[in-house]
Amino acid sequence: VCTPIAGKLTPVPRTATFERPVSGGDALLSIGSLLIGAIAVVAAVVLLVGVFDLNWVLGYAIPLATAVFAVALWQSLSRRGWTWKDLQLTSGPRSLWHLLWEVPVAWIAAMSVGIALAGAVDIAPASDAGGSASTLDALDVGVVAGTLTIACTVLIAPVLEEVLFRRVIFGWFDTRTRWQIAVLGSAVCFGAVHVLPAIALIMVCIGSAAALLVRLHRSLIPGIALHTMNNALATAAVVASI
């Protein structure tokens, strides 16, 4: 965007969402941490399935993946010189009290659009939405596995995924293009990791809503709040179905 000054066009500086810009190296190493977590789970299942019962191994899959992902993500960012402050887990210029109505409205709107789009292209949500099979496996194994899985799904995973998809990937797009494109780009990446077409489409909408809230507040907290609410409702639905 340019404005005329003294007969010349000069670029108008954009207001970045985050204080610290994201480099290509930051993004690549952070994405690599997610892959490391996935590989660790596959390797653990292959190695342990002959030693322990398959249901027991699958019951601890989410806690294992979350732990490996957390360590790998933090190591990748800390090696790049990132600190807790750089994650911007603080309130921005807009009061966080607005989240009391913004998060529910954003979730309802995102889910409505996502389900409508899934219906329009004739792909129905699968029964394993939000990793429900893994949650049920954990609950079948016992209280410890079930509690760890629910805690990871509802509390820990949303923080880690928001750091990756909103702080890093959205931040990378945001420093290179318009914020609207950054919202869509990070949301598509977020949806892609959910694999199943219907779930991926809905997660694109959830990711877009989270990115919009992050952009509005200039803080990662709104994205975490929306992500936590989504996972909590999905987990509650799974537990209620038992």
What are these regions (language model features)?
Residues 124-131, 163-166:
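Short, structured loop/turn "capping" segments at alpha-beta junctions
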Residues 108-112, 138-242:
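Transmembrane helix-loop-helix hairpins at the membrane interface
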Residues 122-125, 177:
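Glycine-centered loop/turn motif at secondary-structure junctions
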Residues 1-115, 119-123, 232-242:
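N-terminal, membrane-interfacial amphipathic/helix-forming hydrophobic leader that caps
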Residues 130-140:
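Perimembrane loop-to-helix junctions flanking transmembrane segments
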